[in-house]
A protein has these predicted regions:
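Positively charged n-region of N-terminal signal peptides that target proteins for export
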Residues: 1-5
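Bacterial N-terminal signal peptides
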Residues: 6-16
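N-terminal helix-cap/turn-to-beta initiation motif at the start of protein domains
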Residues: 19-29, 125
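A short, compositionally biased
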Residues: 23-25, 78, 100-102
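Central antiparallel beta-sheet cores of small beta-barrel/beta-sandwich binding domains
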Residues: 26-95
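A short, sequence-level motif marking secondary-structure junctions
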Residues: 43-46, 98-102, 122-125
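Short, exposed beta-strand-loop hairpins at the edges of beta-sheets
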Residues: 94-115
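Edge beta-strand at a domain terminus
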Residues: 111-125
C-alpha cells in the first residue's frame, strides 16, 4: 500500500495554520520533487487542506482536486506533526512536515509506522 503524500501532500491536518509559528506555516503552492504534482496547502474549516492542483501522471490514482485534510501541531523547530486524512481512499496517515523558506519535507506513515514515504516539495509562490 503506497503512501501518497502528493496531496501533501501524501502529505497532513491538525490545527489551523495560525496555531503554528510563521516559520512553520506550510501555506502556499508546492511542487513535488519528482515534478509530477503541484498542490495548494491552505486553511479549510478548522484544519489545513492539501489539494492537488496538477498531476502529471494519474496512473497512480491521484487526480486534480483530490484533497488531504491535515490535523497538525508544532512539533519542534519548523516541524509540524499529526495526521493526514485522505477522504478519497478513507485512509489516515501519521505525518510529519518540516517547513523551510522554500522547501517542505513530508513523511507519511501507515500501519503503525511500518510503511512510510518521504517527499520533498519546492515552494512556488
Amino acid at each position: 500500500m503506497p503512501v501518497r503524500p502528493a496531496l501533501v501532500l501524501s502529505l497532513l491536518v491538525l490545527t489551523p495554520v495560525s496555531a503554528a509559528s510563521g516559520a512553520s506555516d506550510p501555506s502556499g503552492v508546492w511542487t513535488r520533487g519528482d515534478g509530477n504534482a503541484r498542490v495548494r496547502i491552505a486553511p479549510c474549516g478548522g484544519n489545513i487542506c492539501a489539494t492537488n492542483l496538477w498531476i502529471g501522471d494519474t496512473s497512480g490514482g491521484e487526480n486534480v482536486g483530490d484533497r488531504l485534510v491535515l490535523t497538525v501541531s508544532a512539533g519542534g523547530e519548523g516541524t509540524l506533526v499529526g495526521t493526514a486524512y485522505d477522504p478519497q481512499r478513507n485512509l489516515t496517515y501519521s505525518m510529519e512536515m518540516t517547513v523551510k523558506a522554500r522547501q517542505l519535507q513530508t513523511r507519511g506513515c501507515v500501519l503503525g509506522g511500518l510503511l512510510c514515504k518521504s517527499v520533498t516539495w519546492s515552494r512556488e509562490d
